[in-house]
């Protein structure tokens, strides 16, 4: 909210609000998670001021609710995100993503020789948390990559 207490992004009556997305990540989430493949109204706030983060992105999707699996898959991109469930303009549920064991149908394998590029199969990566990184192992080529490599792909 600004100092004059006006919302910078219009409130929604019913749906999902993904808040505290790192700045410059909002569009990537919309694309990767195919959030725009809906007839519902989507409101996007980019580079909004944030007391905690400095700047943040925000996504509001009317009449759409994310599954727990979808929420947890956000953890790679926006580990500090808050996913709010809205009903009649009130927050009726709030959750934070936690790193899942597997991410399906979202990422693309960076190995150009992986069979997933030539065959009509859904991507699938096992998630392994390490001391300073998160590793993703492709189900098909069984190669392991730093999550930064996969996310940049």
UniProtKB/Swiss-Prot annotation:
One of its GO terms (molecular function) is metal ion binding. It comes from the Bacteria. The keyword Metal-binding applies. Its cofactor is Zn(2+). Pfam families: PyrI (PF01948), PyrI_C (PF02748). GO terms for biological process: 'de novo' pyrimidine nucleobase biosynthetic process; pyrimidine nucleotide biosynthetic process. Keywords: Metal-binding, Pyrimidine biosynthesis, Zinc. Zn(2+) binds at residues 109, 114, 138, 141. One of its GO terms (cellular component) is aspartate carbamoyltransferase complex. Binds 1 zinc ion per subunit. Involved in allosteric regulation of aspartate carbamoyltransferase. Belongs to the PyrI family. HAMAP family: Asp_carb_tr_reg. PANTHER family: ASPARTATE CARBAMOYLTRANSFERASE REGULATORY CHAIN. Contains catalytic and regulatory chains. This is Aspartate carbamoyltransferase regulatory chain. The gene is pyrI.
């Amino acid at each position: 909210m600004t100092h004059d207490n006006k919302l910078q992004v219009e409130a929604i009556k019913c749906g999902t609000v993904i808040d505290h997305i790192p700045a410059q990540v909002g569009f990537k989430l919309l694309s990767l998670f195919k959030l725009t493949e809906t007839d519902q109204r989507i409101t996007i706030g980019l580079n909004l001021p944030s007391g905690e983060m400095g700047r943040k992105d925000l996504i509001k999707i009317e009449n759409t609710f994310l599954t727990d699996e979808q929420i947890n898959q956000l953890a790679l991109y926006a580990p500090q995100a808050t996913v709010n469930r809205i009903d009649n303009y009130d927050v009726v549920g709030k959750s934070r993503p936690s790193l899942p064991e597997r991410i399906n149908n979202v990422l693309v394998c960076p190995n150009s020789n992986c069979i997933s590029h030539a065959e009509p199969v859904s991507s699938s990566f096992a998630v392994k948390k390490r001391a300073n990184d998160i590793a993703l192992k492709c189900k098909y080529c069984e190669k392991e990559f730093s999550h930064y490599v996969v996310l940049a792909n």
